[in-house]
Amino acid sequence: MQIESVEIRKVKVGEIPALVKMAQKAFLQAFTEGNKPENVSFYMNDAFTEKQFQKEFESDGSQFFAAILDGKIIGYTKINEVPSQTDIHDPESLEVARLYVLEDYLGMGLGKTLLDLAISQAKEKGKKYLWLGVWEKNARAIRFYEKNGLKIFGSHPFPFGDEVQTDYLMKIEF
């Protein structure tokens, strides 16, 4: 697969069911290892449902962008402005709330393409920085974000089933 054959664009409302299926699969690929199965199930049944995605899709300040290959969603990012941000709540910032690529397509530059899109959205909107939260045990993602210029600037608790995990907060300033 060549990255040039992947279309990157805003998600359309009719694509939410396909996006949810892809998001569930990518989440399981990324977070099954190292987590209790019941916590993974609990979180997925709360955060990765069509109803929840529809609510987020309609929310002021949230946008979804998808990476599409041969009509199939293989990656996506969700960006948030105030009032939809999960933390920070700084009108001069843009949050990358989610960035996932299916395992079969990792290492092809799609994550960077989606992150670059989020950065360009932040700049176009006149934001001073872009930030995100990443699980402290997700070494691959942390390396990816560091390689792309983000730096850890703090942490916050992340409720996950019956435990509270720690997410590093990372940002890049413009």
Language-model features, listed with the residues they occupy:
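C-terminal "cap" of GNAT-fold acetyltransferases
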Residues: I3, D90-L94, K128-Y129, W135-I142, ...
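Extreme N-terminal starter segment of soluble prokaryotic enzymes
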Residues: S5-E7
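Active-site acidic-Proline motif in GNAT/NAT acetyltransferases
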Residues: L102-D104, M108, E136-K137
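Short coil/turn segments at alpha/beta junctions that flank glycine-rich nucleotide-binding fingerprints
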Residues: M108, K125-K128
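Conserved phosphate-binding and hydrolysis motifs of nucleotide-dependent enzymes
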Residues: G71, G75, G109-G111, G149
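Acetyl-CoA-dependent GNAT
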Residues: K10-I16, K21-E33, S41-D104, L115-L117, ...
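Conserved acetyl-CoA-binding loop-helix of GNAT-fold acetyltransferases
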Residues: G107-S120, R143-K147
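Short acidic-aromatic loop segments in the C-terminal HATPase_c
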Residues: Y100, L150-K151
